[in-house]
Amino acid sequence: MNRERLAALLGRERDSFAARHPRSRAAYRAGGANLLGNVPMTWMNKAAGRFPVYLAEARGATVVDLDGHRYVDLCLGDTAAMAGHSPQPVVAAVRRRYAEAGGATAMLPTEDAAWVGAELARRFGVPLWSFSLTATDANRWAIRLARLVTGRPRILVFNWCYHGTVDETFITLDADGATSRQGNVGAPVDPAVTTRVVEFNDLEALDRELAHGDVACVLMEPALTNIGIVLPAPGYLEGVRALTRRHGTLLVNDETHTLSAGPGGCTLAWGLEPDLVPVGKAIAGGIAAGAYGVSAEVAERVAARRDADLIDTGGVGGTLAGNALSVAAMRATLEHVLTDEAFEHMIGLATRYTDGVRGVLDACGVPWSVVQLGARAEYRFTSPAPCNGGQSAAAADDQLDDYLHVYLHNRGILLTPFHNMALMCP
């Protein structure tokens, strides 16, 4: 690759981006007075154009920025808006709860909660559910319950995994073994103390680490999604389940991103049998909400621990978790938006996208790969497609990423800013 030419092309696109977005640039500069990093949340600084565009409005798969530019949104809030922006059934449910009935958060249950629990149980095959405000918290609380019932201190994750900002998951593999992930901010402890880590698709490594007998749970996405999409090899997930059972370790399937595989995520689509299932982001149509499901066996083991404080300050739960507004939005999303029929349509769109990208790559003789997981698809700068997180991370190219992102941005297309994922909504 001609890096000098790539740098020149990137500079040209960035100049064009800056010229096209004077109001967003002014808003970004104004934010520096009182916002850390100029933005409401520091991740928003991941912008190939050197500053983010500012949102004016969004509906469905269309975003309009402060300067009036319209975009086809294939980022969809990095999955949080997988139901599309402001779907009408969710808008109506939120209006009823907040404006008509009132009581957005009264720390009291509503009848919607039982409906949502039953629907999640139907989709994921895990019978008992509890709610959070984020998928990160759903993962945290699932880990706490796993430690409670197993009496074991550690968890196991996969190299270059993503499970929100759960402290224990900021661990990777290098030539010397497990190490804290580069850039890990203010880590409370060395994650090697709390966590074991292996490569995805490596059953021998998993068996070896679980044999230590100190792992409460394996926390995993059934397919990696945040280091590019890495699919499981044939028989791999069945092997993971067999090994966790053999070693007395619980299996936690984080379906927050892999919900794109279908109405019940990979758990339903692939017939998986996890012990706990955290999920979040998309399940409330863009309103903050998360949930975690537990098997009947885990629930019985939790109930048997009379010393565990699940009512007050035992470390599981939160004041806003399960609030009436979020639960109403979850019900509307699951009942009317992210339906079986909607997923069929979304997956069809993703297949069309995947076939189109692959066709362009083949026609141009570009040695990249494109991988689909239900309603999401992603290209990587290598072929064949990576089979684990380490391989996928090694294929990353920040300069090329920036160029493609700002190029597409200037032509009205948004991809997720952290990699090259395209997600479809109903």
What are these regions (language model features)?
Residues M1-P426:
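Conserved N-terminal phosphate-binding loop of PLP-dependent enzymes in the Aspartate aminotransferase
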